[in-house]
Amino acid sequence: KTRSVATRAGIVSVDEILSELNVSSLNRLFPVDTRNEERTRAAGLHRWYELQFDTEVDLDLAAQKLSAVAEVANIQFNTKLEKMWDGKATPLRSDAPAMSAGTRSIVWPFNDPELKRQWHYINKGDKAVAQTAREGADINVEEAWKLTAGDPKIIVAVVDEGVKYTHPDLAANMWVNTREMTGTTGVDDDGNGYVDDYYGYNFVTNGPISWDVVDAKGDGDSGHGTHTAGTVAAVNNNGIGVCGVAGGSGNNDGVRIMSCQALSGTAAGSGTTAVMARAFKYAADNGASIIQCSMGIKGGGYTSDDQYAKNAKAEHDALAYFIATSNCDAIDGGLVIFSAGNDALDRAGYPGAFRDYISVTSFSPDFLPASYTNYGPGCNISAPGGDAYIASNSTATVLSTMPSEMNEGSDYGYMQGTSMACPHMSGVAALGLSYALKQGKHYTRNEFISMLLTSVNDMERYLDGTKESNGTMYLENYRKQLGTGAVDAYQLLMQIEGTPCLKVGVGAEELVPLTQFFGGSATNLTYTGVSMSAADMAKLGIETLPTMAYGKLKIKCTKSGVAKITVTAIGGGDKVGTGTVMGGMTITKEFAIIARGVQAGNGGWL
């Protein structure tokens, strides 16, 4: 334990009530971090206390009496959040079904043998994943990895079950508290209020991180935290297992995972507000730039931001503290990313639905909403979470790392849920911050979030008719309800780079206006050329070099992918000025082509 037991506050009016209520313990909710106590007090977090009562005490009456004391500003019950998944995990076995011949023949960007099964990163439309799989229903990370695969200076706090920090595909990307690792066992060597927090901390038991605690019925840990961590940053290009979105290139350059354990077996404190709040503040005080949290309250539990902020104030205050903390030169605050919820309700669950946090919905390999995903108000963006009901096995769900102790001896397994969509978003955000560092860019939090939420592909054209999954889904109900679109890692990096993106469809010739690149008079300019490398044309299956027609780009892509193209025009007149002839000047624009399904006229917004 890191905190001593006290029962009185030292304020007479408060202590009278505490004595009357037989309070068994009273402690500061947030332990003293000597390095950050001034900031803690400035944020008012030092005023939060956690009270425990004897079992026979009427808690409603206790809250009523305490709230009547002038010195007490807020009373909050220690409610629980839950994991956003369906409770089922399927181990990856050595006899797992083979992928199709086409998928097996692909030259993959990294040598991790199971990357071919991670459709959620690179989806080639393999029918071995699902008969309805669509090429491009992924996060478009393959080309992004050529620009960056992560940066160790970016720390992602996984607030979840404990992460198995000894996992062979995670160990190299775990955040390490070097002061504690090289210090004295049983001593708070870095003064942050926690003892022996080597890779993070177990806020439920106030002790070491665990990932394999179950009771006699098998209830308890499930591997959920290790699975979400692997999606963010399983080690890439190490010749084993799977890849992580921001897991590096095999050169010790992945982002780092901090395990902030908020669920532990069947312990009474698992997922409570007190535990969550401490985990969020710890992440801020110890260097994290992103909170990855695939947890929440069932949709409808809260129905407005004000209601959530009032009734979950300790948690909300801790998240506000995290948001106000800059731990990375690329951004002036922290990013908070939650799953939207698995209740198939027409609203997101809180905390994710709160306006300052990113709430992630889920799609499956068919580029359609997953059967379980929440949608509607409070939902910001969509990412792959899988859908077990569209395939005869688990291939249509998300493959990631698992603790072998919980997974029939396998280090890898499949899960589905907005819990699985959420870490894809956290991984893409981590890639974006990594690339911003590489480019020497700095953004406000709002600027970065705006780029993140507009780096999307359109799913709207598919939302007609029905989908057969866990029952019949009427797809029109999801129109404009899943967020801004399906997250696209490459588009985010292009926004950071400053290279504009042109979204086109696949399979049909298109005339694409260039107004957004050449201005309102783009159709009236004289264009002198279009250039594109043979390699880039091959990436998109372009057989004939694109041309300009009627002031628009004439292009036909037959493959999903990304590539660069350059268009040259004359600014002023129809010829370029020379030493002897008056004329205009050459204007050259390079942009990235994103070929992903068919692009709607709304620019990619759902």
Regions found by a protein language model. Give the residues of each.
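Acidic-leg catalytic submotif of subtilisin-like serine proteases
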Residues: 70-73, 134-209, 226-231, 235, ...
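Substrate-binding/access-modulating region of protease and related hydrolase catalytic domains
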Residues: 146, 150-152, 161, 169, ...
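Protease zymogen maturation seam
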Residues: 35-50, 64-155, 163-169, 173, ...
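C-terminal subdomain of the subtilisin-like protease fold in secreted/lumenal serine endopeptidases
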Residues: 281, 286-295, 301, 333-334, ...
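Active-site-adjacent substrate-recognition loops and nearby beta-strands
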Residues: 242, 268-269, 274-276, 301, ...
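Flexible, small-residue-rich helix->loop connector segments that border functional cores
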Residues: 159-166, 179-192, 206, 216-222, ...
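Surface-exposed or secretory-pathway low-complexity segments enriched in glycine-proline
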Residues: 508-509, 519-552, 560, 591
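Hydrolase catalytic cores
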Residues: 229-232, 258-265, 281, 289, ...
